[in-house]
Amino acid sequence: YRDAKITTIYEGTNEIQRVVIASHLIGRLGKSSGGESRSAAKKPAPITGIRKRTIFREGDAAQQVNDLVAALKKDGHDFSVGIPMDTPIPKAERVVSAGKGIGEKKNMKLVEGLAKATGAAIGSSRPVAETLKYLPLDRYVGMSGQKFTGNLYIACGISGATQHLKGIKDASTIVAINKNGNAPIFKNCDYGIVGDVMEILPLLTAALDSGEKQPAPP
């Protein structure tokens, strides 16, 4: 068989070889009636499921931020209430996360400011916690880290690696801010702004800052 896998097994010092042939059937779909493979006929769905994928492009950065805030409020997000930034990720209803696009550690203050204005807990991608060590390991979100299932996730400078997207696939609303318009996160978000986090985050923080937050209902 062309698709067979041949495994050589050595037994003891005599190196007696046995050939085991196993057909590779997983992932090999039959042909459709039209002659095209089913896998080619149907594109894979986004990792985070069906999303709005609304990217705000009109006007300058300030207008894009205002359009984003208006959309979030229209969806029912109330920014007069909030949770502590150190709330455990699995228990948080809102999370603002930093990716490597945040740059130097001093720029984490922008993420913290947005988390406070949003009334959200703070999180990160795996490299930010594990490699850069900007946050403790229990703050990174992903398949091998914390799972977020709350109502609002804001990804700041996160490109959208598969393992990260699988950690947020059950979020109600995903917002992406990244200067790379081709980043996978934009195919897996509800709302997005293609822009530099250094410019967008201060604008978004100012737009959402409604003063002291009331405790979010349990």
State the predicted function of each range:
Residues Y1-S39:
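Glycine-rich phosphate/cofactor-binding loops in nucleotide/flavin-utilizing enzymes
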